[in-house]
């Protein structure tokens, strides 16, 4: 008789957990109890789940686990930004970054090891695509970070109330293109939103995409969360060069998809992310082109100073030029922000994720890895 497959319960959203418990002959309410123990009380095993029948706990011990990330490093920046490097096997590592602010705490989560989109200004794409992360590996980043942060503040695990939660916002802006890992990302986000798990609102969970148009439509139909689009260019010729996916889904299609998404979105605008590249996409003429491109899409712009990496052949736009570019947008009435660099002293700034593993040989020896992927968020 073949051995039974061990299930990582972090891979199951509420519906999946109900089905799993049903397969064990248990009622649906047991799934809610399990979910609360795992996602609200940070249970590491089944013994402490005291409101579950002992018979169920014994069943679970032989059939299921509560997976936890294999943390390779944990660093805190001078500005409070915290970065975890997580081993996801076969020499691959991804990073999770927490950015504290006065009124909120934002967690940047990865969805893939590597990335196939290969944007010109993004180091992750230069490393190639390795694999999709599982639902458990994605939501596990939130679980790990939330309870690590609570522990550092002396807060005990428990149901998420406003006074308890440390992470108030999640952005799917780490390594990878989330919409190319849709089947794992959506269940993970369902758990982020579930009141029996993390209880975040749809306005506080943001998915960032480079423009996978068919999956944008599917997300809008199934789980419309806040949406950010990695735009980076005001015309197809330049975007074809910077974001090769544009050749498959050009700007006309992308803008139409944004309009469709806004009909169901929890926010009344799309956030367009725009990496500022010196002499490439940063002139006032480019800004005016952007205004024409997006005139029918309610939006805000987030201008991102480029964080250079070796062999990119690109430079960060000068600060004064970024301000001039922003002013063109602001003068037209478009809300525009310039992203503040956070965590750059621990290589956790935008574009630096997992980009500073200084001694690869020692890290590989420690993890049994043959390679380490450098991760950079766009």
Swiss-Prot record:
Disulfide bonds: 108-350
UniProt enzyme class: transferase
Domain of life: Bacteria
One Gene Ontology term from the biological process aspect of the record: rRNA base methylation
Binding site for S-adenosyl-L-methionine: 176-177, 208, 230-232, 307
Protein EC: 2.1.1.192
One example GO MF annotation: rRNA (adenine(2503)-C2-)-methyltransferase activity
Keyword Methyltransferase: yes
The keyword Lipoprotein is annotated on this UniProt entry: no
Annotated catalysed reactions: adenosine(2503) in 23S rRNA + 2 reduced [2Fe-2S]-[ferredoxin] + 2 S-adenosyl-L-methionine = 2-methyladenosine(2503) in 23S rRNA + 5'-deoxyadenosine + L-methionine + 2 oxidized [2Fe-2S]-[ferredoxin] + S-adenosyl-L-homocysteine; adenosine(37) in tRNA + 2 reduced [2Fe-2S]-[ferredoxin] + 2 S-adenosyl-L-methionine = 2-methyladenosine(37) in tRNA + 5'-deoxyadenosine + L-methionine + 2 oxidized [2Fe-2S]-[ferredoxin] + S-adenosyl-L-homocysteine
UniProt-listed InterPro entries: Aldolase_TIM, Methyltransferase_A, RlmN_N, RNA_MTrfase_RlmN, rRNA_lsu_MTrfase_RlmN/Cfr, rSAM
Names of required cofactors: [4Fe-4S] cluster
Gene Ontology CC terms: cytoplasm
Domain Radical SAM core: 101-345
Subcellular compartments: Cytoplasm
Keyword annotations of the record: 4Fe-4S, Cytoplasm, Disulfide bond, Iron, Iron-sulfur, Metal-binding, Methyltransferase, rRNA processing, S-adenosyl-L-methionine, Transferase, tRNA processing
Co-factor binding comment: Binds 1 [4Fe-4S] cluster. The cluster is coordinated with 3 cysteines and an exchangeable S-adenosyl-L-methionine.
Amino acids binding [4Fe-4S] cluster: 115, 119, 122
SUPFAM superfamilies per UniProt: Radical SAM enzymes (SSF102114)
Active site: 95, 350
HAMAP family given in the database record: RNA_methyltr_RlmN
Similarity comment text for this entry: Belongs to the radical SAM superfamily. RlmN family.
Other comment: Reaction proceeds by a ping-pong mechanism involving intermediate methylation of a conserved cysteine residue.
Role this protein plays: Specifically methylates position 2 of adenine 2503 in 23S rRNA and position 2 of adenine 37 in tRNAs. m2A2503 modification seems to play a crucial role in the proofreading step occurring at the peptidyl transferase center and thus would serve to optimize ribosomal fidelity.
Name the UniProt record assigns to this protein: Dual-specificity RNA methyltransferase RlmN
Gene from which the chain derives: rlmN
């Amino acid at each position: 008789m073949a051995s039974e497959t061990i299930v990582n319960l972090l891979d199951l959203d509420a519906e999946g957990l109900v089905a799993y418990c049903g397969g064990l002959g248990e009622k649906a309410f047991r799934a809610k109890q399990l979910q609360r123990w795992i996602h609200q009380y940070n249970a590491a095993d089944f013994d402490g789940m005291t409101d579950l029948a002992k018979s169920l706990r014994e069943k679970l011990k032989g059939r299921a686990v509560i997976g936890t990330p294999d943390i390779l490093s944990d660093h805190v920046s001078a500005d409070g930004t915290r970065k975890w490097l997580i081993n996801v096997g076969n020499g691959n590592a991804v990073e999770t970054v927490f950015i504290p602010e006065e009124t909120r705490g934002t967690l940047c989560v990865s969805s893939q090891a590597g990335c196939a989109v290969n944007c010109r200004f993004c180091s992750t794409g230069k490393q190639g695509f390795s694999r999709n992360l599982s639902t458990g590996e994605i939501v596990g980043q939130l679980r790990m970070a939330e309870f690590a942060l609570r522990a550092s503040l002396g807060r005990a695990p428990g149901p998420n109330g406003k006074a308890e939660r440390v992470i108030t916002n999640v952005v799917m802006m780490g390594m990878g293109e989330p919409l190319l890992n849709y089947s794992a990302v959506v269940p993970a986000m369902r758990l982020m939103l579930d009141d029996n798990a993390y209880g975040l609102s749809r306005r506080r969970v943001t998915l960032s995409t480079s423009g996978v148009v068919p999956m944008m439509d599917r997300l809008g139909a199934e789980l419309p969360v806040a949406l950010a689009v990695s735009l980076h260019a005001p015309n197809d010729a330049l975007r074809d060069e910077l974001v090769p996916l544009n050749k498959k889904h050009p700007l006309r299609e992308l803008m139409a998809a944004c309009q469709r998404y806004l009909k169901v979105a929890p926010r009344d605008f799309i956030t367009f992310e725009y990496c500022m590249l010196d002499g490439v996409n940063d002139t006032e003429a480019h800004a005016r082109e952007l205004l024409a491109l997006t005139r029918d899409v309610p939006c805000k712009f987030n201008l991102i100073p480029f964080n250079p990496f070796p062999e990119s052949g690109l430079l960060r736009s000068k600060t004064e030029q970024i301000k001039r570019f922003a002013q063109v947008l602001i003068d037209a009435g478009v809300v525009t922000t310039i992203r503040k660099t956070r965590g750059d002293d621990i290589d956790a700034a935008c574009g630096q994720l997992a980009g500073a593993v200084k001694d690869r040989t020692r890290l590989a020896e420690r993890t049994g890895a043959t390679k380490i992927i450098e991760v950079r968020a766009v």
